[in-house]
Swiss-Prot record:
It comes from Bos taurus (Bovine). InterPro entries: Importin-a_IBB, Snurportin-1, Snurportin-1_N, Snurportin1_C. One of its GO terms (cellular component) is plasma membrane. The modification N-acetylmethionine is found at M1. Keywords: Acetylation, Cytoplasm, Nucleus, Phosphoprotein, RNA-binding, Transport. The record marks S106, K145, W278 as: Interaction with m3G-cap structure. Functions as an U snRNP-specific nuclear import adapter. Involved in the trimethylguanosine (m3G)-cap-dependent nuclear import of U snRNPs. Binds specifically to the terminal m3G-cap U snRNAs. CDD domains: Snurportin-1_C. Residues 69-89 have a biased composition (Acidic residues). Residues 1-160 are annotated as: Necessary for interaction with XPO1. Component of an import snRNP complex composed of KPNB1, SNUPN, SMN1 and ZNF259. Component of a nuclear export receptor complex composed of KPNB1, Ran, SNUPN and XPO1. Found in a trimeric export complex with SNUPN, Ran and XPO1. Interacts (via IBB domain) with KPNB1; the interaction is direct. Interacts with DDX20, IPO7, SMN1, SNRPB and XPO1. Interacts directly with XPO1. Its interaction with XPO1 and binding to m3G-cap U snRNPs appears to be mutually exclusive. Can form homomers. Residues 1-40, 69-90, 319-362 are annotated as: Disordered. This is Snurportin-1.
Amino acid sequence: MEELSQALAGSFSVSQDLNSTAAPHPRLSQYKSKYSSLEQSERRRQLLELQKLKRLDYVNHARRLAEDDWTGMESEEEEEKKDDEEMDVDTGKELPKRYANQLMLSEWLIDVPSDLGQEWIVVVCPVGKRSLIVASQGLTSAYTKSGYCVNTFPSLLPGGNRRNSTTEKDYTILDCIYSEVNQTYYVLDVMCWRGHPFYDCQTDFRFYWLHSKLPEEEGLGEKTKRNPFKFVGLKNFPCTPESLCKVLSMDFPFEVDGLLFYHKQTHYSPGSTPLVGWLRPYMVSDVLGVAVPACPLTTKPEYAGYQLQQIIEHKKSKKEGIMGKLTPRASENGHYELEHLSTPKLKSPPQRPNHPESLMEN
């Protein structure tokens, strides 16, 4: 373990995607790069300022997603690409699909914000896969974060089935985590509700709206013929030390994958952003410096050390690519952030009951 820690200190960046949550946390062995921390903190400040100036046409954007109508998008895409460069938002790998890169993804929470207790909200996330849900024109479609439609079904979401889709403008767009085990879409965030876009609304308002409106849709949390998958809202909590300790001691109706930390003022911006942070529960004590209770969620798993090995292997393959010796294996690792889950699978999983094989694609 000591050798791995020393090797890790050689450099911080594990990928082309800064602090991607698909790779292991850079501070698992108490390693911390001052430059990286300052950079993440500074990028947060800049993004909060720039989002005040950047006002996109989210009404048309939501309509295009709902109606699958992309007429005249070529010129707008060029303009958006320039805006993303100015905003320092990583929209990920370019894919020939209109529904790709529509979700707001997180970075590993490396720099502890000075206003964590006042300006941040935490959401406990289940094991599952991130899904873009579009309910429109009497059907509900589920897309992966790469833009592939993996399922189409009726639902009791506004616009999600022929009975409740009264007008063409009655559509809904949600950011969800799909649990195959529970046959449930856990609703993480809302981008559009009944044709009203919420992209440029602050996180605390989006969450308030979401948890006010979801219970109003009768039968949405039940599995029926008209609603074959349950839709359940994920609760959010304050980020004070007392609140975090209470959250980590709770029992949840699902297998917990990790914690998403949202800045209250951030707008919903597709692509990865430092205004949303990701931690596994057992990292809270080391990274945030919070005294946590001894419970299953805070117990360090046996694969924690393996994550360090993944960092070293990924650094090695990346270095080979830079040197012009990119092997097929290294090339595969080069897309680590897009293809792997929040915690890598073990080649030989540790002998531990109920070890999560498939964690959230975050």
